[in-house]
Design a protein with these regions (language model features):
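Terminal connector regions
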Residues: 26-28, 35-53, 59, 156-215
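Short structured motifs
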Residues: 82-85, 138-142, 155-156
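Short Pro-Gly-centered flexible turn/kink motifs
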Residues: 146-157
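Low-complexity, acidic Ser/Thr/Pro/Gly-rich terminal tails and inter-domain linkers that flank the onset
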Residues: 22-95, 103
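Sec-dependent N-terminal signal peptides
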Residues: 4-13
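Boundary at the C-terminal end of the N-terminal hydrophobic targeting segment
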Residues: 17-21
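Intrinsic-disorder/low-complexity, polar/charged segments enriched in Ser/Thr/Lys/Arg/Asp/Glu/Gln
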Residues: 93-97, 152-154
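The feature marks short-to-medium sequence segments in extracytoplasmic or secretory-pathway proteins
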Residues: 105-147
Length: 215
């Protein structure tokens, strides 16, 4: 029994080290919850943050080079949702792929908390207004991550299911180097959530869904 537990632990640790969960041979579960989940868009960069005091959480999700077969806007920053591509989210749930792309010729910097970017998923509520269905927890451990020209980060995002059918998108709050704050929105897509996801925040417990997510 101890050997089995040790083997499972080794597999879990190897997945975490890669920074991106691999598909499990078992069918992926649907994510049907009744609360706002904490943000999970963690990113790393090869450029060190010389302004941070240290002690912040790190990530293994490093940038990738834009390839010729990728259809991405040139000359701008873009947040791209790819709902038609299923990926593993939090090791056992069906998710979708999201790209944050630097199509400019400049190195871009992004504020983060424990390497968590300011990205959340939003949905149109019953009143027809865009509202977040995820939230960013408070943290004193701020840091910067950098994205070089023609690079992008790839994320596995939550694909929610629920009784309320709606439109969804992702929103990035980006503070440029001149301290000007901008909102960057992804393309919209069809999906569903539960009504409580607009108001009830996930409890900060050791058994939360995000404890199974790879940074």
């Amino acid at each position: 029994m101890k050997k089995i537990v040790f083997a499972v632990l080794c597999i879990a640790l190897s997945i975490c080290a890669k920074g991106q969960a691999e598909r499990s041979p078992a069918p992926l579960k649907t994510l049907n919850i009744e609360f706002m989940m904490r943000g999970y868009f963690f990113a790393a960069s090869s450029v060190p943050d010389k302004e941070a005091f240290g002690g912040f959480g790190t990530s293994a999700n490093y940038p990738r080079d834009i390839t010729t077969d990728m259809t991405v806007p040139d000359g701008t920053i873009s947040l791209i949702a790819r709902p038609f591509e299923e990926v593993v989210f939090a090791r056992e749930y069906s998710g979708l792929k999201v790209w944050l792309v630097n199509g400019t010729n400049e190195r871009l910097r992004f504020n983060a908390q424990d390497s968590r970017l300011y990205i959340v998923q939003e949905a149109i509520d019953v009143d027809g207004k865009w509202k977040p269905v995820e939230y960013l927890p408070s943290s004193w451990c701020g840091n910067l991550v950098f994205l070089d020209p023609k690079e992008y980060w790839e994320f596995a995002a939550a694909r929610y299911t629920g009784k309320f059918k709606t439109r969804l998108r992702f929103r990035l709050q980006w503070q440029k180097s001149d301290n000007k704050k901008l909102m960057v929105y992804s393309n919209e897509f069809d999906g569903s959530v539960n009504a409580k996801q607009f108001t009830v925040k996930e409890e900060d417990t050791p058994t939360s869904i995000m404890d199974r997510h790879d940074n």
